[in-house]
Amino acid sequence: MQIKAFLGGYDKNLSYLIWCEATRIAGIIDASIEITEILECIDSNNLLLEKVFITHTHFDHIKYLDDLTDQFPYLQICGYKNSEEKFTDNYRELDHHEIITLGTEMITVLHTPGHYPDSVCFWNKKGNFVFTGDTMFVGRTGRTIGPKSNNSCLYSSIYDELLKLPQQTVIYPGHHYGYKKSVTLKENISLSPFFQCNSEDEFIRVMEDYEETRRN
């Protein structure tokens, strides 16, 4: 699978155009970037855009979804089954560990609540990469300051799901907040105390300490 990252949006957002090399069928991870450059890439690579994958429904990750569906009315919108947002008749409700096809490629859905209840990550086992939205960034997790956020859920999502993936899995996050756009899980663990905790209580302390630094 090929991956092209696009940086912009509300706050260093990252959208990704992905496609199956064998079929030229493409998808977009998060509609968070103004679409002109993405459309140019679709045209220049002779791609057929089939799906948009939504990592969660915070406004900045779906801001340009209407622009995409205006251009491609047949688009299938793929998001978590219990999301409060239902975008179009083409909305596909995803379940935990469901497998989606994109051409000949297979993508596994991982429900990863914590930052937001409908957060999901999209893992391609063959390519050894995962799109983590706002669940995991380079160097830290997503924040849990919203009324629907939950530290305990985020701990489970990180330690029982993402950190159980192969250590050489490359993460592609929803924002460019780190020293580079993507790293392996192994590297992320080595550089961040968020991913070195031995218990949920320790993880929550790390989260609270981080928020304290934001206030100072």
Features from the language model and the residues they span:
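Active-site neighborhood of phospho(di)ester-bond hydrolases with catalytic His/Asp-centered motifs
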Residues: 28-29, 50-58, 76-81, 111-114, ...
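Divalent metal-coordination and catalytic microenvironments
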Residues: 18, 30, 56, 68, ...
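Active-site HxH/HxHxD metal-binding segment of metal-dependent hydrolases
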Residues: 12, 23-26, 33-108, 190-194, ...
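Aromatic/hydrophobic pocket-lining residues that form the small-molecule binding cavity
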Residues: 31, 62, 154-158
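Hydrophobic residues at beta-strand termini and immediately following loops
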Residues: 6, 94, 185
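Metallo-beta-lactamase
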Residues: 116-215
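Conserved beta-strand hairpin/beta-sheet module of binuclear metal-dependent hydrolase folds
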Residues: 1-45, 121-133
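Pocket-forming structural segment of enzyme catalytic cores
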Residues: 98-99, 104-123, 140
